[in-house]
A protein has these predicted regions:
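Sec-dependent bacterial lipoprotein signal peptides
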Residues: 1-17
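Activation on beta-sandwich/Ig-like modules and their edge loops
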Residues: 19-174
Length: 174
């Protein structure tokens, strides 16, 4: 029994020491909803020149994340969340420490990052679901919004959401 215990302790010691400091330090928050604009009249154009509502995702990990195959919705317990196409990984992959803007315009013909859900200025939820359609990757329920003023995470405290008079889609919040 004593030999078994020593063997077990040695195995644990090997496993713990085999994890490099870098492996432990790369534990980020992963994929997060970082900023959004629920009433875009004249702030930020998409590549087609349209002023559409948008949600910005941020990859806080050290690995690329492809959101293709994940689901997006604005309604908790939505039985028909929008499936983000997996056919264009060049468009749907977020590089490490990178940003990606999803346009909420119900105009999927404009590309993989244009979803069938629109955001309500009056307030609602933003929910990103994993490929199993059940696991919430990140979500935020927001209050009533002001036109052309975005809401996003405070860079000094990611748990705090604040308003931005100068929205920054695809860039760090300021």
């Amino acid at each position: 029994m004593k030999d078994y215990l020593y063997g077990f302790l040695i195995l644990i010691l090997i496993l713990v020491t085999s994890c490099s400091e870098e492996d432990l330090s790369t534990e980020g928050r992963g994929l997060i909803i970082n900023e959004f604009l629920a009433s875009n009249d004249s702030c930020c154009k998409d590549s087609n020149g349209d002023y559409d509502d948008w949600v910005e995702l941020y990859n806080d990990s050290n690995q690329p994340i492809d959101i293709g195959g994940m689901y997006f919705t604005d309604t908790p317990n939505d039985d028909k969340p929008y499936l983000i196409p997996s056919s264009d990984p060049n468009s749907t992959t977020i590089q490490p420490k990178g940003y990606l803007v999803i346009w909420c315009d119900d105009d999927q013909e404009q590309g993989a990052l244009h979803v069938s859900k629109k955001l309500s200025k009056g307030g609602e939820s933003i929910i990103l679901l994993s490929q199993d359609k059940l696991t919430i990757v990140d979500s935020y329920t927001f209050p009533e919004q002001t036109t052309d003023i975005s809401m996003g995470r405070d860079q000094n405290d990611f748990t705090n959401w604040i308003f931005f008079e100068n929205p920054t889609p695809g860039l760090p919040n300021n």
